[in-house]
Amino acid sequence: MSLQWTAVATFLYAEVFVVLLLCIPFISPKRWQKIFKSRLVELVVSYGNTFFVVLIVILVLLVIDAVREIRKYDDVTEKVNLQNNPGAMEHFHMKLFRAQRNLYIAGFSLLLSFLLRRLVTLISQQATLLASNEAFKKQAESASEAAKKYMEENDQLKKGAAVDGGKLDVGNAEVKLEEENRSLKADLQKLKDELASTKQKLEKAENQVLAMRKQSEGLTKEYDRLLEEHAKLQAAVDGPTDKKEE
């Protein structure tokens, strides 16, 4: 394997490792969000868009080169005179196998680049939704406690007005308290609606993350299968070559 394809294969192994690491269930999205917001990661992300575009361009060029090589060595029987070159068939099959291997490596690297970027985005969105969900819960609880407090004060004022024989202007106080209660109830209902909307968004984000995890696991299994086929084909190609050398 040449130097460039060794680098691409190493990059593919690193992508598979990072995807599996992001799919670990016991690491919460909040912890990943803290890691993503660290200084080192932010420094990398500041140059990440340029690096991502350059990486995509390189991988696309490598995919095109691999496709060109496959088409070059595809019709072996039409291009090789087997009578004059008995060993040329094996040579062309080896070239075709390497071109197909390079296409798989470059294609999976390109696909996992988009998958990894999308997975990081979904994890960040899920962490943000979880944080906003907790904030809305706390805000709703504080509003509910304030409403209960005003209702208790209202009851106390009513009792005090009854004891004083109706001398106090209870009517105005009741109107103000009722207005405050209505305002608090409206705020509480608004917070409940926002909390329900946030829960729906959170469930949607969790479903997307789960789908991405299943897709990444499927890609990993497919890549393992291709590695096994690669090993079998390499053994099949190396076997006749070793016999000829002997």
Curated annotation (Swiss-Prot):
Protein name as it appears in the record: B-cell receptor-associated protein 31
PTM info: Cleaved by CASP8 and other caspases.
Family named by the database record: Belongs to the BCAP29/BCAP31 family.
Function noted in UniProt: Functions as a chaperone protein. Is one of the most abundant endoplasmic reticulum (ER) proteins. Plays a role in the export of secreted proteins in the ER, the recognition of abnormally folded protein and their targeting to the ER associated-degradation (ERAD). Also serves as a cargo receptor for the export of transmembrane proteins. Plays a role in the assembly of the mitochondrial membrane respiratory chain NADH dehydrogenase (Complex I) by stimulating the translocation of NDUFS4 and NDUFB11 from the cytosol to the mitochondria via interaction with TOMM40.
Any one Gene Ontology cellular component term annotated for this protein: endoplasmic reticulum membrane
Cellular localization per UniProt: Endoplasmic reticulum membrane; Endoplasmic reticulum-Golgi intermediate compartment membrane
Source organism of the structure: Pongo abelii (Sumatran orangutan)
GO biological process: one example: intracellular protein transport
S-S bonds: none
Membrane topology value: Multi-pass membrane protein
Residues under site feature: Cleavage: D164, G165, D238, G239
Residue ranges annotated as Lumenal topological domain: 1-6, 65-102
Keyword Metal-binding in record: no
Gene field: BCAP31
Transmembrane residue ranges: 7-27, 44-64, 103-123
Coiled coil: 165-237
Assembly behavior: Homodimer and heterodimer with BCAP29. Binds CASP8 (isoform 9) as a complex containing BCAP31, BCAP29, BCL2 and/or BCL2L1. Forms a complex (via C-terminus) with TOMM40 which mediates the translocation of components of the mitochondrial membrane respiratory chain NADH dehydrogenase (Complex I) from the cytosol to the mitochondria; within the complex BCAP31 interacts directly with unprocessed and processed NDUFS4 and NDUFB11. Interacts with VDAC1. Interacts with VAMP3, VAMP1 and membrane IgD immunoglobulins. Interacts with HACD2.
UniProt topological domain (Cytoplasmic) ranges: 28-43, 124-246
Motif Di-lysine motif per UniProt: ranges: 243-246
